[in-house]
Amino acid sequence: MIEFKKVEKVWPNGKHVLKDINLKINAGEFVAVIGLSGAGKTTLLKTINKINNISSGEIFIDINENEKYEINKTKGKSLRNLRKHIGLMSQEYNNIEKQTVLKNVLNSRVAQMNFFRAMAGFFTKEEKQNALAALEKLNLLEFSYIRADNLSGGQQQRVALARTINQNPKIIIADEPVSALDPILANRVMEDFKKINSELNITVIINIHHVDLALKYCDRIIGLKDGEIVFDGDPKKLNESKLEEIYGK
């Protein structure tokens, strides 16, 4: 569960990018955040793992009964532990192109390895099996030993998703992951998100400009306008009037 209480974010130049954000996202939800560029979507997502600090308010994250975090008070080792549970994706694939697909997926475990094993690039049999399972989950197993730079953009983004789920996260935050893809590939990637959300019960929060994809795949849509939530609910209730409120000038 992720809960925002009266969250505000003001940049040093005085720009108010998040205004009185109050919302609760339950475990296992697939949530789309929509709105114009500059509405505060990316800033909102980046407060969840404290890439962006908030100016006021509170954010609470419950990973399980034994791991509960108040973001304002989370730092050091506690923050590192929280971030292990949060997978990050963006429109950039962030693959190492000269490495194989399997090695790219294995790289998600490096942060949890000791220094010498990480430097040597040594992965255990279990780690390799888990990485292959992540690729199989997304029907990418046949590409395991192919260099990443031989794949299409859509395939590379799906490898990035496999790498993210190999991290074994409870939450995935995706910032415009399909913006650089054509409609067919964008749908394929969204299908993958939906699959891992439903089959692995991973909470997925996605910042997306494609409203049609949000309506098609997501359980809930949050609409931001000038840093404020102006819509939060079932995609079926997102009518023309609400879209005009979110995107109108």
Swiss-Prot record:
Q: Which Pfam families match?
A: ABC_tran
PROSITE patterns in alphabetical order = ABC_TRANSPORTER_1, ABC_TRANSPORTER_2, PHNC
Where does the protein end up? Cell membrane
Ranges of residues in domain ABC transporter: 2-246
Membrane topology, as annotated? Peripheral membrane protein
Catalysis: reaction(s): phosphonate(out) + ATP + H2O = phosphonate(in) + ADP + phosphate + H(+)
Task: Name the UniProt key words of this record, in alphabetical order.
Answer: ATP-binding, Cell membrane, Membrane, Nucleotide-binding, Phosphonate transport, Translocase, Transport
Query: Which of this chain's residues are annotated to bind ATP?
Result: 35-42
Which NCBIfam families does UniProt cross-reference here? ABC_phnC
List, alphabetically, the PANTHER family matched. Answer: AMINO ACID IMPORT ATP-BINDING PROTEIN, PHOSPHONATES IMPORT ATP-BINDING PROTEIN PHNC
The UniProt entry's sequence similarity note says: Belongs to the ABC transporter superfamily. Phosphonates importer (TC 3.A.1.9.1) family.
| Subunit details | The complex is composed of two ATP-binding proteins (PhnC), two transmembrane proteins (PhnE) and a solute-binding protein (PhnD).
Name of the featured protein: Phosphonates import ATP-binding protein PhnC
Q: Which organism is it from?
A: Mesoplasma florum (strain ATCC 33453 / NBRC 100688 / NCTC 11704 / L1)
**By which gene is this protein encoded?**
phnC
